[in-house]
Amino acid sequence: MTDKIRTLQGRVVSDKMEKSIVVAIERIVKHPIYGKFIKRTTKLHVHDENNECGIGDVVEIHECRPLSKTKSWTLVRVVEKAVL
C-alpha cells in the first residue's frame, strides 16, 4: 500500500493572517443532468511558515497533519509570483 501525499495547485486569495494563507482551488465539473461544464472553487487554509506569499500568487500545496481547526495543508513552493 502506498501513501501518496495529495498535492494541489491554486491561487492565493488572502494573506492577512500571520503564517497562514487562503488558497482557491478551481476545478471543472460536469453538471449531472444538463452536461454543461461548471467551474467550482474550493478554499483551503494553508500554513505559510515564512510569510512568503502574496495575493495573486500561484502556489503548490500538499496535505499534512492538522495544524489547527481549519489548517491541514502546507506550502511547498511558489510557482508564479503575482504581477503588480
Swiss-Prot record:
It comes from the Bacteria. Keywords: Ribonucleoprotein, Ribosomal protein, RNA-binding, rRNA-binding. One of its GO terms (molecular function) is structural constituent of ribosome. SUPFAM superfamilies: Nucleic acid-binding proteins. InterPro entries: NA-bd_OB-fold, Ribosomal_uS17, Ribosomal_uS17_bact/chlr, Ribosomal_uS17_CS. The keyword Ribonucleoprotein applies. CDD domains: Ribosomal_uS17. Gene3D superfamilies: Nucleic acid-binding proteins. GO terms for cellular component: cytosolic small ribosomal subunit. GO terms for biological process: translation. Part of the 30S ribosomal subunit. Belongs to the universal ribosomal protein uS17 family. One of the primary rRNA binding proteins, it binds specifically to the 5'-end of 16S ribosomal RNA. This is Small ribosomal subunit protein uS17. It comes from Enterobacter sp. (strain 638). The lineage of its organism: Bacteria, Pseudomonadati, Pseudomonadota, Gammaproteobacteria, Enterobacterales. The gene is rpsQ.
